[in-house]
Amino acid sequence: MIIKPKVRGFICTTTHPVGCEANVRRQIAYTQAKGPIENGPKKVLVIGASTGYGLASRIAAAFGAGAATIGVFFEKPGTETKTGTAGWYNAAAFDKAAKEAGLYAKSVNGDAFSNECRQQVIELIKQDLGQVDLVVYSLASPVRKLPDTGEVVRSALKPIGEVYTTTAIDTNKDQIISASVEPATEEEIQNTITVMGGQDWELWMSALRDAGVLADGAKSVAYSYIGTDLTWPIYWHGTLGRAKEDLDRAAAGIRGDLAAHGGTAHVAVLKSVVTQASSAIPVMPLYISMSFKIMKEKGIHEGCMEQVDRMMRTRLYGSDMALDDHARIRMDDWELRDDVQQTCRDLWPSITSENLSQLTDYSGYKQEFLRLFGFGLDGVDYDADVNPDVQFDVVTL
């Protein structure tokens, strides 16, 4: 079939397998061009490995450090008449490239919140790798089914305490609007912590430890975002911030556990990037469009791949992790530079529908958004007939 993008709200309902592969190959080429990651990981588990920062982590580990990788994700394959999720095609493309390079790669497609998934992964590690020396936790899900009770808990992206009203982009109409979000109830706050906090990361690390599949000196990293005062009401001071604070709590406990065997665990705070997750948060598309323009002009722009590659080379496996007061790795250091943030603050009040394209990199935002789904990549013939049914070596639960 010939596949074109169909965008509804903050989701693209079609995906392009060849475009997704081109996107993965582009990221692989970036890491390879940087040369080997010295003293990098050798056996890596990535939980949430099919898109965004998780996919970038798997690529950096495999193609930067030559690591064997196991990736866990929850994606839908395509059929002859319907496209699968972008993450499915990304994972398939990664698997293909890894096999071509002679690298071990296995994938598990299932609910990473479930005990069954943990058990399957542990068996795979025991059977093929023995132990892992890096665990990357990069899940972004709005819903979590609790493993013991089966209860389904939903998160809420909301402010706390009062209504949040802000300037935002209506991405369907490319217009500046005023958006208001009602504050979260106490139950919504707790639910968001349950879904997006550190509890599941702890369950994974405990299960891996108890099964004896964590190598001495093993490291673990979970990803977070803090942002700036421009986004704090909806993010860091909202329900998401509470969940991310819980991630810090979990990190301290996991760090204590791993330290006994020479290992460590940290939250890595990353910069804002275009992902399916960030495009769902009011204010983020506008903020990202602004910060992209400013950071590109200053030559310090990074996407997921650039961020993770720099983190692995200079921090996680570098000479100095440069941790903050909460023992977090700060990869948002360039975005939070005073010159970048002050320019954002100055710009914010003056943006209108008419000057949106001139004052921000909204066109770059939209291009990046479509790339997530495999569209708008150089060298891909989008008028060609492609088969959406792509198969690869994956254990499906």
Swiss-Prot record:
Pfam families: Eno-Rase_FAD_bd, Eno-Rase_NADH_b, Enoyl_reductase. Its EC number is 1.3.1.9. Pathway: Lipid metabolism; fatty acid biosynthesis. The record marks E75 as: Plays an important role in discriminating NADH against NADPH. NAD(+) binds at residues 48-53, 74-75, 111-112, 139-140, 244, 273-275. GO terms for molecular function: enoyl-[acyl-carrier-protein] reductase (NADH) activity; NAD binding; trans-2-enoyl-CoA reductase (NADH) activity. InterPro entries: Eno_Rdtase_FAD-bd_dom, Enoyl-CoA_Rdtase_cat_dom, FabV-like_NADH_b, Trans-2-enoyl-CoA_reductase. Gene3D superfamilies: NAD(P)-binding Rossmann-like Domain. Substrate binds at Y225. The active site is at Y235. One of its GO terms (biological process) is fatty acid biosynthetic process. Coiled coil: none annotated. Keywords: Fatty acid biosynthesis, Fatty acid metabolism, Lipid biosynthesis, Lipid metabolism, NAD, Oxidoreductase. The keyword Lipid metabolism applies. It catalyses: a 2,3-saturated acyl-[ACP] + NAD(+) = a (2E)-enoyl-[ACP] + NADH + H(+). It is an enzyme of class 1 (oxidoreductase). Involved in the final reduction of the elongation cycle of fatty acid synthesis (FAS II). Catalyzes the reduction of a carbon-carbon double bond in an enoyl moiety that is covalently linked to an acyl carrier protein (ACP). Monomer. HAMAP family: FabV_reductase. Belongs to the TER reductase family. This is Enoyl-[acyl-carrier-protein] reductase [NADH].
